[in-house]
Amino acid sequence: MSMTDPIADMLTRIRNANMARLQKVDIPSSNLKVNLANVLKAEGFIKNYKVIADSRQGVLRVYLKYIDEKDPVINEIKRVSKPGSRVYVGSDKIPSVKNGMGVAILSTSKGLITDKSAREAGVGGEVLCTVW
């Protein structure tokens, strides 16, 4: 069965695993999802991730991060740009998430980067999601 929004599926799996206090969550892998996990790790929202090869597309295993082993580091993770309603911003209109406490992840010509990196580089793009 085809999936209309694989990024929303990934974010929902992470959100649900956080609420269930799971240590890890398995997600069908793709290059975009691996890049998104890389940004989440660099920003300190997840512990780690790894790609497990299988006979099909592979599995992205995301290790979740908690504060004092009980409270999730990710309070909210939200999809912004959706397949039916894309959200593009210029370099001067990049949103600030929770007054800088969270991050917006953008898909730009320089790859997936955070809102802060996009402002510094002076590039705009598609706002994939916000995390805080």
Swiss-Prot record:
NCBIfam families: PRK00136.1. One of the primary rRNA binding proteins, it binds directly to 16S rRNA central domain where it helps coordinate assembly of the platform of the 30S subunit. Belongs to the universal ribosomal protein uS8 family. GO terms for molecular function: rRNA binding; structural constituent of ribosome. One of its GO terms (biological process) is translation. SUPFAM superfamilies: Ribosomal protein S8 (SSF56047). Keywords: Ribonucleoprotein, Ribosomal protein, RNA-binding, rRNA-binding. It comes from the Bacteria. InterPro entries: Ribosomal_uS8, Ribosomal_uS8_CS, Ribosomal_uS8_sf. This is Small ribosomal subunit protein uS8. The keyword Ligase does not apply. It holds the Pfam family Ribosomal_S8. GO terms for cellular component: cytosolic small ribosomal subunit. Gene3D superfamilies: 3.30.1370.30, 3.30.1490.10. Part of the 30S ribosomal subunit. Contacts proteins S5 and S12. The gene is rpsH.
